[in-house]
Amino acid sequence: MTEIRRIQDADVAGKRVLVRVDFNVPMKDGQVTDATRLEAALPTIEYLTEAGAKVVLLAHFGRPKGAVVPEMSLEAVCQPLADLLGDAVYFSTVTSGEDAVAATMDLEAGEVLLIENTRFAAGEETNDPGFAAALAELGDLYVNDAFSAAHRAHASTEGITHHLPSYAGLALQREIDHLVAALESPKRPVIALVGGAKVSTKIDLLQNLVKKVDTLFVGGGMANTLLHAQGIKVGSSLCETDLVDTARAIFAAAEESGCKLMLPTDVVLAKEFKPNPETRLAAVTDVEDNEMILDCGPATVVALGQAIDRSATLIWNGPLGAFETPPFDAATVEAAKYAARAAVEGELIAVAGGGDTVSALNQAGVSGDFTFISTAGGAFLEWMEGKTLPGIAAVMGTPELVA
């Protein structure tokens, strides 16, 4: 992979540095209820202020669709961010234009200005060249620190980079460095755990992973489709019968590349999908027509643990069962605890990502034990699919514009 341009390589002293951050935080009644994403931006902001930069923050919040929606104003973020920084955060009520430019010009070295929600402008999500140019007037150079938005070619993530020297912030660097280490140049053997409801949402992911990992375990509802393609009856389970050919192509690709493809061998069954119904543990070949597969069984988890023991790197995306409904969280929780223990006590590099995955690891109480957890949903998935992310491509290679 081409090297990314890092903010440490730029001369930022006295310059207006535009930083694209992810401040799409949970809010209730105008109050930030979870400051995790604000905290993630602190290292880059503090690095720049200490280096004497004038920091101008760009972010989106919600989906206002190009209109000014007062409830989606980023002004509510200013005080929580100021509290975390221990310093004032100024706010521009407009996203671009003379007043916004004037606000950036008024900054002293080491001060921070937050620009209003970029999605209040219709040109943000359409990557309008005119709006991108207007945003570029707010700074002398640009830093992307929002991996979670890097898969979107928007004005504040891609268009702006055609006007300013562009670099990766510290949080973005951390994401990329860990993902490159896990997928592009990993310690081998590599095992990937992929779960979730539908194969259709992760076809590209599976097709990319079988070419890059040594072992691929598929769980969750996705596994039902692969089992069905092998001629195994899955009863009334969620199953995409129209994807049999796709599933068989994945098996063939795995065999061709020498990737061992693992599926559940025993399963937890129920006739109703509800919390704590009557369940039955059975071999995967012993599913009745009126039963649903809702989790992997204990023998499968043991086999998965043994496969993890044989691996040096683990990549995890998606739960292994219907984890949000007990008791069908058991396999996911047990596998997560096993992987976490291997990461803490052994030398396993354990990387996970995706919204459901993060929730599952939090539920298992092991988030802090994984080597790295990406909170980016779509961007993490697209990276794992081997796709080029516009926001990343924009900060790679030799800069066309030099600060």
Swiss-Prot record:
Family annotation (InterPro entries): Phosphoglycerate_kinase, Phosphoglycerate_kinase_CS, Phosphoglycerate_kinase_N, Phosphoglycerate_kinase_sf
Family stated for the protein in its record: Belongs to the phosphoglycerate kinase family.
Gene: pgk
Highest rank taxon of the organism: Bacteria
Catalysed reactions, semicolon-separated: (2R)-3-phosphoglycerate + ATP = (2R)-3-phospho-glyceroyl phosphate + ADP
Record pathway: Carbohydrate degradation; glycolysis; pyruvate from D-glyceraldehyde 3-phosphate: step 2/5
Record text on subunit structure and interactions: Monomer.
Protein keywords: ATP-binding, Cytoplasm, Glycolysis, Kinase, Nucleotide-binding, Transferase
Cited Pfam families: PGK
GO biological process: gluconeogenesis; glycolytic process
Compartments in which it is found: Cytoplasm
PROSITE patterns: PGLYCERATE_KINASE (PS00111)
Residues annotated as binding substrate: 22-24, 37, 60-63, 119, 152
Binding site for ATP: 202, 324, 354-357
GO cellular component, one term: cytosol
Molecular function GO terms recorded: ADP binding; ATP binding; phosphoglycerate kinase activity
UniProt-recorded name of the protein: Phosphoglycerate kinase
EC number: 2.7.2.3
